[in-house]
Amino acid sequence: MADWARAQSPGAVEEILDRENKRMADSLASKVTRLKSLALDIDRDAEDQNRYLDGMDSDFTSMTSLLTGSVKRFSTMARSGQDNRKLLCGMAVGLIVAFFILSYFLSRART
C-alpha cells in the first residue's frame, strides 16, 4: 500500500478513503435499517401472540368453570339412589356410542 500511496497525491488518497468510508457507512446504515425493521416485526408478532394467549386464558377459565359445574352435577346424580345409577350407566353408554358414531362419520368425511 505504501507504493500505491506514493504514486498518488495525498488529496487523491484521502478522497478514495473518504469514498470507501461513505460506501461502508451506507452499507452499515442499510443493515441497521433492516435489523430495525426485523426487530419491529418480531415485536408486533410477539404482541399479537400475547393477545391470542390472553384470549385463550379466558376461554380456558370459562371452560374450567363449566366443567367444574358439570362434574358437580354428575357427582350429585351418581351419589343419589339406585334408579339414577341405571340412568347414569345408560347415559354413559349412549355417550360412548354417540362418540364412536360421530368419529366414524368424521373419518369417512375426511377420506
UniProtKB/Swiss-Prot annotation:
The chain crosses the membrane at residues 87-107. One of its GO terms (molecular function) is SNAP receptor activity. GO terms for biological process: protein transport; regulation of retrograde vesicle-mediated transport, Golgi to ER; retrograde transport, endosome to Golgi. Residues 15-77 form the t-SNARE coiled-coil homology domain. One of its GO terms (cellular component) is Golgi membrane. InterPro entries: BET1_SNARE (IPR039899), T_SNARE_dom (IPR000727). Residues 108-111 are lumenal. Residues 1-86 are cytoplasmic. The modification Phosphoserine is found at S9, S37. It is a single-pass type IV membrane protein. It is found in: Golgi apparatus membrane; Golgi apparatus, trans-Golgi network membrane. Keywords: Coiled coil, Golgi apparatus, Membrane, Phosphoprotein, Protein transport, Transmembrane, Transmembrane helix, Transport. Vesicle SNARE required for targeting and fusion of retrograde transport vesicles with the Golgi complex. Required for the integrity of the Golgi complex. Component of a SNARE complex consisting of STX5, YKT6, GOSR1 and BET1L. Interacts with STX5. This is BET1-like protein. It comes from Homo sapiens (Human).
